[in-house]
């Protein structure tokens, strides 16, 4: 969650994620945006890890699972446009998931996302990052969404429930 990460730490993370017997998707955010000198671009990632690298939403098909995982990245520390703007998952009978960094009902510079955009997205589930507190499972329209929070607080201003969602 920052641009000043030791390469050894990133390599250890890549090895750990490579040991997970499942696909892993990463949507870089405002503190770790994707760029040519980011830890994401400068690291050899295992085949099971996909890092979203553009502000445009892209989809990755998971053959045999009837599922598409969509996502996008911050490529600069600020984004005043909703990453969901103009997105609609195709109504094709598949499960459509998305990983994004953004601020639900936010008005600021960190990917503001309106609840109406979530409801209109056609997604099955939207996995969000940015808010370091657990939101619990929420629903907008037919789309479930959640912030898991961070695994542990990074300061005394980040107390309360923490965790991950699997």
Roles of regions detected by a PLM:
Residues 3-162:
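His/Asp/Glu-rich metal-coordinating catalytic cores
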């Amino acid at each position: 969650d920052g641009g000043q990460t030791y390469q050894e730490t990133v390599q250890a993370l890549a090895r750990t994620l490579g040991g997970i017997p499942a696909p892993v998707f990463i949507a870089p955010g405002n503190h770790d945006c994707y760029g040519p000198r980011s830890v994401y671009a400068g690291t050899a990632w295992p085949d099971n890890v996909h890092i979203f690298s553009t502000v445009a939403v892209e989809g990755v098909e998971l053959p045999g699972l009837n599922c598409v995982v969509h996502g996008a990245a911050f490529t600069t520390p600020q984004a005043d446009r909703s990453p969901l703007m103009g997105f609609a998952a195709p109504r094709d009978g598949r499960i459509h998931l998305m990983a994004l960094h953004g601020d639900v009902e936010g008005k600021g510079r960190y990917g503001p996302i309106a609840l109406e955009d979530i409801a209109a997205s056609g997604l099955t589930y939207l996995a969000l990052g940015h808010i370091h507190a657990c939101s619990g499972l929420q629903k907008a329209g037919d789309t479930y969404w959640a912030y898991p929070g961070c695994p542990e607080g990074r300061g005394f201003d980040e107390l309360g429930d923490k965790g991950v969602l699997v």
